[in-house]
Amino acid sequence: MKKNLIVLKNFKHHDDMSEETLCFSADVWIGGYKAGYAKNGGYGGQTDIHGYDAKGRELLKFASNQIGAMPPEIIEYMGRTLTINSTLENFIDKLTEEMIQEKENKRISNWIKKKLPTGIIAKNGDEYHYFPFLSRNTPEGRQMIINVAKREYPNCEILNKF
């Protein structure tokens, strides 16, 4: 089933309440119809999905059957091969993870845009480090700060373009 046929709206992620699974709530829209809602308390249980009305329950059942007919996902985890069945719950959980990652990427992008004019940004793996110009916003000063960043994080990538 195409992802754009199933959309989560009114999405709320509660990171502070996420323990073993993601704690969230969202309306589930199928084919432009507000079919129901999904929620997970974040305690390690499965995602609960409920229809708002008879048509919503029918659409959720149809979506569940369509997704259930899809091949399972095979992943490698800690040296083992795992088979994850295609279910509506797993599909919605994956949408949730993508939405959270998209939000985090946007947050990082905005932070970088804000900080670039005032300092050097060094990316080291998944981490970002900020080195302010202070009074060294000259070509020599910038190079000095880049050298400090490279000394502290030898494999880092400098995101500034001069």
Where are these regions (language model features)?
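Terminal leader/tail segments of proteins
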Residues: 1-162
